[in-house]
């Protein structure tokens, strides 16, 4: 398992790297934003621990650049920026988790274990329900065989709902599995992405395929629900 630690404070970076190396990971380190982007675009990493306040290039810009061509590598933001707006921006830009400084190494290692476990869970290539089909490899969505353009988070929501057909999925579950975090303050972000997803699907299908069951959560509408 190969990790990259991007952190401009050398003492913190080296301490994290040593802890993860001792835990059995192969670890590279980088203290500069521009150098980090070069590493990321030329090497293959399973997970990146990414600071935001970096010399040379801001961590958020690095993340956005990465996600233009790579949705598979896990990214855990580790930053002193602790405002809700910072967390929302980071998660919406494609981070899988967001951890504030100061932090405990044990918690960081636990989050890394959780993220890397999820990466290697075997999934069906295509998930289907009625007129909806989601290709988990190509990350493409079809409704009545018409390709629909969805954002990264909308795809994540739809994928998780299709993986859990037949039961409502709570906002807390979506937060944990789509955003890889469990922060109550992001429930508004879920509603925004959910509303957009439902509108896009309804425009093609002619009906809203997602039910909101009050007090329970969201689920894909099935024949028994119509």
Language-model segments: which ranges?
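A structural micro-motif at secondary-structure boundaries
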Residues: 128-155, 219-226
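Short aromatic/basic micro-patch
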Residues: 126-128, 133, 168, 191
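The C-terminal output helix
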Residues: 113-126, 166
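Structural detector for helix-capping/boundary residues
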Residues: 43, 106, 130-132, 137, ...
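Positively charged, aromatic-enriched patches within helix-turn-helix-type DNA-binding elements
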Residues: 140-209, 214
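N-terminal/domain-start alpha-helical segments
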Residues: 1-119
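Glycine-rich nucleotide-binding loop
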Residues: 35, 215-219
């Amino acid at each position: 398992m190969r990790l990259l630690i991007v952190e401009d404070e050398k003492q913190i970076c080296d301490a994290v790297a040593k802890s993860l190396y001792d835990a059995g990971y192969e670890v590279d380190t980088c203290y500069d934003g521009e150098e980090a982007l070069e590493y990321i675009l030329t090497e293959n990493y399973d997970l990146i621990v990414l600071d935001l306040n970096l010399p040379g290039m801001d961590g958020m810009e690095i993340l956005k650049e990465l996600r233009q061509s790579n949705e598979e590598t896990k990214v855990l933001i580790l930053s002193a920026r602790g405002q809700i707006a910072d967390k929302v921006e980071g998660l919406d830009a494609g981070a899988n988790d967001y951890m504030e400084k100061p932090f405990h190494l044990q918690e960081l290692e636990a989050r890394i274990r959780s993220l890397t476990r999820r990466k290697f869970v075997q999934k069906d290539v295509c998930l289907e329900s009625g007129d909806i089909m989601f290709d988990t490899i190509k990350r493409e969505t079809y409704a009545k065989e018409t390709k629909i353009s969805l954002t990264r988070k909308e795809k994540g929501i739809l994928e998780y709902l299709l993986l859990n057909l037949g039961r409502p999925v709570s906002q807390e579950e979506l937060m944990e599995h789509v955003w890889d975090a469990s922060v109550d303050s992001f429930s508004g972000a879920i509603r925004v992405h959910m509303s957009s997803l439902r509108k896009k699907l309804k425009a093609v299908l002619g009906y809203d395929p997602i039910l909101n069951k009050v007090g329970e959560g969201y689920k894909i509408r099935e024949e028994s629900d119509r």
